């Protein structure tokens, strides 16, 4: 379906159930979706990207900006061949604390640093959300110029297991996770 509406339009289209989109956790690029008003992920404004609420002067539209990704300063490689792409904290203070911490790869002397998102004309990619009785309208502006961060549930799992305080354990957890995935495949 051709998406000719803009999130800022005074009136957005009314769509039938068959015209609604499947939820996209990793929306990337200039795109528009309309989700079912009862979709839990859409209601929570879920995204795989690390997004934080940013100032928007329209109270009917929620604006979120991408925070980028935490990477190793020496761009090391884990034993499984993957690179460090951690989810930055949403809170400014917590994000500042993340920077400069030792790389979770035990074989690396690098430090964690933020690779900011600059995929929208040099500015962070933005996601816009608007709730109507008919659906939840989503619009993204920009293309992420960095790798995907670890999934949010991975970070929460590490925290629940008590691994969040000792980032060195991340490499071990990633290696175990990779080995488990290989066994399942």
Model-derived regions, located:
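Cys/His-rich Zn2+-coordinating "finger/knuckle" modules used by eukaryotic regulatory proteins
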Residues: 87-143
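Histidine (H) residue identity feature
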Residues: 30, 38, 45, 57, ...
């Amino acid at each position: 379906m051709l998406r000719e509406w803009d999130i800022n339009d005074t009136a957005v289209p009314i769509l039938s159930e068959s015209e609604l989109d499947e939820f996209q956790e990793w929306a990337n690029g200039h795109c528009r979706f309309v989700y079912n008003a009862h979709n839990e992920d859409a209601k929570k404004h879920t995204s795989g990207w690390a997004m934080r609420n940013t100032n928007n002067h329209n109270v009917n539209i929620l604006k979120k900006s991408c925070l980028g990704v935490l990477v190793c300063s020496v761009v090391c490689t884990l034993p499984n061949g993957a690179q460090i792409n951690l989810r930055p904290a949403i809170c400014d203070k917590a994000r500042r604390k993340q920077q400069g911490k030792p790389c979770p790869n035990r074989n690396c002397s690098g430090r964690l640093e933020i690779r900011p998102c600059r995929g929208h004309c040099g500015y962070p990619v933005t996601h816009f959300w608007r709730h109507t009785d008919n659906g939840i309208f989503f619009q993204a502006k920009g293309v992420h110029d960095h790798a995907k961060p670890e999934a949010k549930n991975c970070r929460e799992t590490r925290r629940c297991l008590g691994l969040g305080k000792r980032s060195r354990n991340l490499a071990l957890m990633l290696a175990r996770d990779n080995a488990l995935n290989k066994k399942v495949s």
